[in-house]
Amino acid sequence: MLEIVLSNRFKKDLKLAKKRGLDLNLMDKVVSSLASCQELDEKSHDHPLSGNFEGFRECHILPDWLLIYRVDDEEVFLFLSRTGSHSDLF
């Protein structure tokens, strides 16, 4: 199981998600799957990012609720970078 590390920006994004009334249990399920190195469902559209987010991956919790994360090279940490809608993140 990977150790989960939250960025400061992710913590702010999480507060906004709570304020918007999003179901944080859905995020917990996705993060638990990632932390235990399980593959995500096809509907999550997990894929690598490029540009400013090169080295990171993105998955969909809901169609317009995304999670940007990175697994470190030694596969010890799961770094949660951002969460939010497409317009929030890009």
What spans do the regions from the language model cover?
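Basic, Lys/Arg-enriched alpha-helical interface segments
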Residues: 1-63, 72-78, 83, 87-90
